[in-house]
Curated annotation (Swiss-Prot):
This is Putative deoxyribose-phosphate aldolase. Signal peptide: none annotated. GO terms for molecular function: deoxyribose-phosphate aldolase activity. Its EC number is 4.1.2.4. Keywords: Lyase, Schiff base.
Amino acid sequence: MATIVPTLFSFVRDTYKGRFDVATFEREVGRDFDNQEIAQAISKYEQEAKNLRNKDEIRKVIQYIDLTTLNGDDTASKVVALAKRAINPVPTDPSIHCGSVCVYPQRIADVKKFLASSKLNSNITSVAGGFPSGQYHLKSKVLEVELSVADGATEIDIVISRASALDEDWKTVHDEVLACKKACGSAHLKTILATGELKTLSNVYRASWASILAGSDFIKTSTGKESVNATLEVAYVMCTAIKRWHELTGKKVGFKPAGGIKTVDEALSYVALVKDILGDEWLNPHLFRIGASSLLDDCLKGL
């Protein structure tokens, strides 16, 4: 550890100066994961989720949710209805709010207009930067981020280039995320790794690091459009990267699993994982979100 830490601090310093050294990146973040160790940990988290299940924890889960609609038939009335629900998800308790409402860029202005007219507040998340494929020119990705922020998005969810990741071109992955981060201005950046398309856990770890080094405020598992979305396996790897970053720099990066999380028990498994790897200080909406469209329904059944 004594020899690794100064090297990585130097790498972090140089990366933020725009010098991404590939050899140093590979030396510092290239690692393999023990599948048996991960499987044992996941079994523990799933059991702990059952023990966590109570009304207080369910209320906390609701506050982690980025309440999402990302469909081709989304209309102004549909996203406004979603925003109303995100602001007051539990009718009997107006103090509870979802983490944000998440919509396509074209619908940001609809949510913003509703919030202004009703004098209500909510974080507005928008997917941008070539969502969900990432197969766009960088200029168009950056422009979409800029337009989304101008329309009122307070949080931007971009997606990395899986093509670059699978080609092990981590410098390009990093540089594209960095360009989008700069375009965000004061908006928070959540970077989606689309882990279901990265093939290996080592790639997930490297993608996590490339995204963190580029200044991501959160790293997120999935777009929700892949054939395999959030899993506890990739969450374990991503949170391991976040933990290592915090150990070395003292800086905290958030974590967002998304895609296919529909039940309270599933959500609480991620809560148990984050609690174990990152600690209680991560269990708040500033550092932990869950991207979901139907999870709220199951939460309300449990209250």
